[in-house]
C-alpha cells in the first residue's frame, strides 16, 4: 500500500507548470511518432519514429480480432523480454504474418487459460502495447505483463515458454479517440495502468494534425518500476510545450526530485489545469485503491459510475473524467 506524501513544488517548477498549462498548443513537429515502441531486458529499448513522408499509404490488411461471436483465438508465444524484476514483454504471433490485430486505440483483449486442476478458466483483460490503428504492427501483438503474487493470469503468463499458446478474444472498445477533440488531456496512471495511456499518447503524437496537449501523472513503487520512461522522456524533449510527465514513488531513491508515495490532492492541484479553464479530459487507470482515491470505481465495463475522490474535490465533473 502506498504511503502518503506531501508534494512541495519549488517556485521555479510551479511557475513552469503554470506556464505549460496556460500555453496554447504549439504546431506539431514534422517528425511524428510512427511505429511500435518495444521494451528490452532491464534497460529497455524503443524504435525511433519516422517521418510520414517516408511512409506510403498502408494497404488493406486482414484483421485477426473481429469481435461479436468470433470466439477465442489461440496465439503462439514467439518472444519474451525481461523488462525488470517483475515485468515481461510477451510477443504473440498471428497465423498470417501480414495481418493486423484489428484493435482500435486504447482497446483491450481478453486472455484465457485453464490449468489442469482448475474448475473454471481464468479470464483477464490486457491492453497491448504494440502499434495499433493506421500503422499497426504486422503479424504480432505485444503485452506488457506485471507479475502479481496472487494474480493467477499474470503468474501463468510469466511462466509461459516460447512456443506455448494463449487464448485471446476481442476487441473490447474503450474511449473513442478523436484528434484535437480536447485541448488538454491528463493521464493518471499506476503500475501497468500505463498501457492504455501509452496507446493514447502514441496515437496523439503520431498524428501531425492532432494538437492535443498531454500531462501524465504516473505512480509506482520504485524507480525501476517506471515502465516506458525512456519513451516518455523522448516525448518531453521532442514536444516540451505539449507533453509533461510527473512521477511519484512509494520507495524513492536518494536525491529523488519528484513525488513520494501516493498521488495526492496537492500534486494534482499543482500539475493539472483547473477544471474550468480549458477543454480537458482526464483518464484514470490503475489498481482499485487508486481508483477509489482519485475518481471512484467503475460500476461495470459499460458503466463509469459516479465521480468521487480527489478529482471531485478539485472541482472536475463526471463528464471530464474517463476510467479505463
Swiss-Prot record:
Domain of life: Eukaryota
Gene Ontology molecular function terms on file: cytochrome-b5 reductase activity, acting on NAD(P)H
Record's subcellular location: Mitochondrion outer membrane
Any one biological process term the GO annotation gives: ergosterol biosynthetic process
Cofactor requirement: FAD
EC annotation from Swiss-Prot or TrEMBL: 1.6.2.2
InterPro entries (UniProt xref): CBR-like, Cbr1-like_FAD-bd_dom, FAD-bd_FR_type, Flavoprot_Pyr_Nucl_cyt_Rdtase, FNR_nucleotide-bd, OxRdtase_FAD/NAD-bd, Riboflavin_synthase-like_b-brl
GO (cellular component) term, any one: mitochondrial outer membrane
Bilayer topology annotation: Single-pass membrane protein
Domain annotation FAD-binding FR-type: ranges: 70-178
Record Gene3D superfamilies: Nucleotide-binding domain of ferredoxin-NADP reductase (FNR) module, Translation factors
A Pfam short name: FAD_binding_6
Annotated TM spans: 31-47
Residues annotated as binding FAD: 181-216
Catalyses which reaction(s): 2 Fe(III)-[cytochrome b5] + NADH = 2 Fe(II)-[cytochrome b5] + NAD(+) + H(+)
Keywords of this entry: FAD, Flavoprotein, Membrane, Mitochondrion, Mitochondrion outer membrane, NAD, Oxidoreductase, Transmembrane, Transmembrane helix
Function: May mediate the reduction of outer membrane cytochrome b5.
Family: Belongs to the flavoprotein pyridine nucleotide cytochrome reductase family.
Protein name, per record: NADH-cytochrome b5 reductase 2
Organism of this sequence: Ajellomyces capsulatus (strain NAm1 / WU24)
Taxonomic lineage from the root: Eukaryota, Fungi, Dikarya, Ascomycota, Pezizomycotina
Gene it is expressed from: MCR1
Amino acid at each position: 500500500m502506498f504511503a502518503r506524501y506531501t508534494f512541495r513544488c519549488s517556485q521555479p517548477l510551479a511557475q513552469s507548470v503554470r506556464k505549460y498549462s496556460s500555453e496554447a498548443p504549439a504546431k506539431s513537429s514534422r517528425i511524428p511518432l510512427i511505429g511500435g515502441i518495444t521494451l528490452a531486458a532491464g534497460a529497455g529499448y524503443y524504435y525511433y519514429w519516422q517521418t510520414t513522408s517516408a511512409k506510403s499509404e498502408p494497404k488493406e490488411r486482414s484483421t485477426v480480432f473481429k469481435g461479436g461471436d468470433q470466439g477465442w483465438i489461440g496465439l503462439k508465444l514467439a518472444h519474451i523480454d525481461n523488462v525488470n524484476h517483475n515485468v515481461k514483454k510477451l510477443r504473440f504471433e498471428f497465423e498470417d504474418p501480414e495481418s493486423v490485430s484489428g484493435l482500435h486505440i486504447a482497446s483491450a483483449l481478453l486472455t484465457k487459460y485453464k490449468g489442469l486442476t482448475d474448475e473454471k478458466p481464468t479470464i483477464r483483460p490486457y491492453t497491448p502495447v504494440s502499434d495499433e490503428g493506421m500503422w499497426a504492427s504486422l503479424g504480432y501483438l505485444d503485452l506488457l505483463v506485471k507479475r502479481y503474487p496472487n494474480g493467477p493470469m499474470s503468474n501463468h503468463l510469466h511462466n509461459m515458454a516460447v512456443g506455448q499458446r494463449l487464448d485471446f478474444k476481442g476487441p473490447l472498445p474503450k474511449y473513442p479517440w478523436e484528434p484535437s477533440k480536447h485541448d488538454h488531456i491528463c493521464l493518471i496512471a499506476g503500475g501497468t495502468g500505463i498501457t492504455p495511456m501509452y496507446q493514447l499518447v502514441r496515437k496523439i503524437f503520431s498524428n501531425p494534425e492532432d494538437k492535443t496537449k498531454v500531462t501524465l501523472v504516473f505512480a509506482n513503487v520504485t524507480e525501476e518500476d517506471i515502465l516506458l520512461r525512456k519513451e516518455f522522456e523522448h516525448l518531453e524533449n521532442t514536444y516540451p510545450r505539449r507533453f509533461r510527465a510527473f512521477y511519484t514513488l512509494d520507495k524513492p531513491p536518494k536525491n529523488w526530485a519528484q513525488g513520494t508515495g501516493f498521488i495526492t490532492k496537492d500534486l494534482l492541484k499543482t500539475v493539472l489545469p483547473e477544471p474550468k479553464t480549458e477543454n480537458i479530459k482526464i483518464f484514470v487507470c490503475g489498481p482499485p485503491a487508486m481508483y477509489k482515491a482519485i475518481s471512484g470505481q467503475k460500476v461495470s465495463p459499460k458503466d463509469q459510475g459516479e465521480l468521487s475522490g480527489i478529482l471531485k474535490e478539485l472541482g472536475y465533473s463526471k463528464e471530464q473524467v474517463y476510467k479505463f
